[in-house]
């Protein structure tokens, strides 16, 4: 999982990527290709 300052590019890396908010943090999850997972600082 990458920890990024901005998720703007992370959400467009793959068509299945979606943004989720958990415990006040923003996450990008991708079920079909989990290496695109990311979290915002």
From Swiss-Prot:
Q: What Gene Ontology terms describe what this protein does at the molecular function level? A: structural constituent of ribosome
User: How is this protein annotated for GO cellular component?
Assistant: ribonucleoprotein complex; ribosome
Enumerate the Gene Ontology biological process terms: translation
What would be one Pfam family of this protein? Ribosomal_L36
Q: Which keywords annotate this record?
A: Ribonucleoprotein, Ribosomal protein
Against InterPro entries, the record matches this protein to: Ribosomal_bL36 (IPR000473), Ribosomal_bL36_sp (IPR035977), Ribosomal_L36_bact (IPR047621)
Cystine links in this protein are none
Q: Which PANTHER family does the record match to this protein?
A: 50S RIBOSOMAL PROTEIN L36 2 (PTHR47781), LARGE RIBOSOMAL SUBUNIT PROTEIN BL36B (PTHR47781:SF1)
Q: Which NCBIfam families match?
A: PRK00831.1, rpmJ_bact
Task: Give the record's family classification.
Answer: Belongs to the bacterial ribosomal protein bL36 family.
Q: Could you tell me what this protein is called?
A: Large ribosomal subunit protein bL36B
Organism, as annotated: Actinobacillus pleuropneumoniae serotype 5b (strain L20)
Q: What is the lineage of its organism?
A: Bacteria, Pseudomonadati, Pseudomonadota, Gammaproteobacteria, Pasteurellales
């Amino acid at each position: 999982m990458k920890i990024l300052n901005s998720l703007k590019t992370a959400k467009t890396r793959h068509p299945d990527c979606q943004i989720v908010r958990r415990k006040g943090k923003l996450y990008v999850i991708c079920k079909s290709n989990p290496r695109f997972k990311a979290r915002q600082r």
